[in-house]
Amino acid sequence: MTPSADDSSPGRARRWPGLLALPLVVLAWAVLVVAPVWIQAAHACFAHFDLGIYVQALARMSLADPNPWLSARQVYIFNDHFDPILVLARPLVVVLPPMWAALVGEALFALLAVAPLLWLQARGLLSRAATGLLAAFLLLSPSAVEALKFPIHPTTWSALPWVMAGVAWHLRRNGWLLVSLVLLFACKEEFAFAGIMLTVALWLRGERRFAVGVGVLSLVWLAGVYGLRPWLLGPSEDYSLRLKQGMDGGLLHYLALRLAPVHLSRVGTLVLLLLPLGVWAWRERVKPDWAWLLVLLPMLGIRFLGMAWRFHYGVPLLAAALMGFLPLLRGRKVPAWVLVSSGLIILFSNELNLRQFTRTLTSSRTYPRQCPGDPSRLDSIARGVEVIARHREGPALLGSNFVSLLADRDDIYAVGGPQPDDGRVYEWVLVEKPPHGEVYPLTYERVTALIDLWRADAGTEVLIDDANVFLARGRFTAHR
């Protein structure tokens, strides 16, 4: 008689960790990261930069107006960053309010970065444990967590095309690689520089005809963004100023700013995350794919010179670096010590983030301090937002954290934010009262003074003036 398989058998028991790895990672991400961010969004916790910018872009983008004017940012969306990947998230606005369309879109892009790895697993090229480990890096690393904690930015979305490109590179799927590059370039203009380095990598690998094609695509994209775009769309935001910051103090001062401990600690965290994989590769005598790792050079240079390692800036760097370990992970069983040590590093490097998010889950009525989920506060905000949304005529001056809630309304501006040069007179004012609300770059004292100034005007019609919100109609000029 043939014995039947038993769930308690040692072989079956050893398979359970591999089977559960990816579901547990996704569950932890959904509960400990996505849910707290969405709770905070529902409580109006996030400033106009960057959530309000991209929510207003999605709300106003259409076939008739593909490059909408963002009144609160005082720029056309593609004259700021060139990130046409936004078009893929635009259909969500049909079924969801703009702010939720943006948040759901960002979460979907982050989660879909795991899909190419699942495809490798289905083909028998990655073990379940390896897939779960890479997913943990992509979804739960400090860079990924802080990117979602600072919504929204298409740089975060670039994890998906970076993983697609890495898989296509290692499998020599040139068609897939080309599609991945187009999606990657559409996330932010800087990624076309990585295309130049990928051209070099392909040339070194002997794929010279395809290398020429990738090089042409990259150069055409760069020429379009930095040459044709200003000619067609008008002046673009000059982000090169960040790269030059500190040059007036001399070379030593310039380098000292970029080598400050706050920046080096971020680099150290990225290196530490990859240390177990690096040690394992050394023990297995698997050489890094130096050709692929060339794509990291432009991003490293831009982040070093621009002192930009936090939030969404680390996501593409980590995603691209992880793809350099595919030759190591392909067809190999990941040692337990790599899984455990990597998991512990992810956990402890996220200690502050997880503590904050756990407080949001367990004490959302009182935390975060500047935007508690107190029912009376939320009711005041809802009443104020409803009035401004119903009266769509006249410029409205809003607290920074209200821009995303009213993104589909014309003529909205943020207190303390960019303003028109024409000395705009605002018909509506809606702000939170300190100590609540997002007031940067102002102070709570200045916002209190502005409320007193607006209230004292003889022509002001005060509509809400409770403990939480100030809403008034009149003629207002002071905005900072």
Predicted regions mapped to residue ranges:
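Start-transfer (signal-anchor) and selected internal transmembrane alpha helices
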Residues: 1-35, 119, 128-131
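Signature aromatic-anchored transmembrane alpha helix within multi-pass, membrane-resident enzymes
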Residues: 23-27, 215-219, 330-358
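Extracytosolic helix-loop segments that constitute the early lumenal/periplasmic catalytic or substrate-binding loops
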Residues: 52-77, 84-85
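Transmembrane-helix motifs of polytopic, lipid-linked glycan transferases
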Residues: 100, 104-125, 133-135, 164
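Specific aromatic-rich, kink-prone transmembrane helix
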Residues: 116-119, 137, 156-180, 197-199
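Short acidic/glycine- and proline-prone juxtamembrane loop motifs at membrane-interface regions
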Residues: 146-155
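Hydrophobic, aromatic-rich transmembrane alpha-helices
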Residues: 266-293, 297-300
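Hydrophobic/aromatic-rich transmembrane helices and adjacent perimembrane loops
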Residues: 290-333
